[in-house]
């Protein structure tokens, strides 16, 4: 542990400012690097970080967080928080009710209720999200009920989401319902939302049931370009 400023008070945890903490595996190879403006060393040896925290994994993956408390558990080789987490992505901000991470992993688990707010408008609500940035990937996965909301539609999925943010592809799993602002509904399965090039295209290769005032259509697959209002 390195810090620019060190405060030690009787019967209180050691306070560190501008801290850099490094963890090592059994062969003394560097695992994680954690950086924060402020941290405390508890009597147990655990280190509690406050505020902005940057975590760099063994393979160089960067996780940027803001939280009231995040604890480096020295005995279990885990990082954990039971406070609200704000996770900063490149084009999105994610909030959750806590987080867990093993020191030798590139995957972070954001637990409880999770909200992903994309910079260009859509909001995704789900639970218990896995964030995987290994080998340059940017994968978000959840098996919980997921709701995607944009300006024109609200999409609900019963079996979760598998999102590849590098490719701007969101896969909503299982039974899916699309509710349009006009009141129209589309029921299908395993929906892909393609956000590439600033667009919003809904695709499904499963059975589709479209309903609107005076309209009832069933089809074997669907392609819906939302910005141009073209459904085929």
Protein language model regions, located:
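Mature-chain termini and adjacent capping regions
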Residues: 1-232
């Amino acid at each position: 542990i390195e810090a620019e400023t060190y405060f030690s008070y009787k019967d209180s945890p050691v306070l560190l400012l501008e801290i850099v903490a490094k963890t090592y595996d059994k062969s003394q190879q560097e695992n994680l690097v954690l950086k924060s403006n402020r941290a405390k060393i508890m009597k147990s040896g655990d280190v509690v970080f406050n505020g902005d925290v940057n975590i760099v994994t063994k393979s160089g993956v960067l996780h940027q967080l803001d939280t009231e408390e995040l604890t480096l558990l020295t005995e279990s080789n885990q990082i954990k928080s039971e406070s609200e987490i704000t996770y900063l992505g490149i084009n999105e901000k994610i909030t959750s009710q806590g987080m867990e991470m093993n020191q030798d992993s590139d995957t972070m688990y954001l637990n409880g209720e999770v909200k992903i707010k994309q910079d260009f408008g859509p909001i995704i609500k789900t639970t218990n999200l896995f964030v995987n940035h290994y080998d340059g990937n940017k994968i978000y996965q959840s098996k919980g009920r997921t709701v995607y909301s944009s300006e024109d539609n609200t999409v609900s999925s019963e079996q979760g989401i598998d999102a590849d943010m590098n490719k701007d592809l969101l896969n909503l799993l299982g039974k899916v319902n699309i509710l349009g602002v006009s009141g129209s509904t589309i029921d299908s399965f395993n929906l892909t939302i393609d956000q590439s090039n600033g667009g919003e295209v809904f695709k499904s290769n499963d059975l589709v049931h479209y309903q609107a005032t005076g309209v009832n259509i069933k089809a074997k697959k669907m392609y819906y370009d939302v910005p141009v209002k073209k459904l085929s």
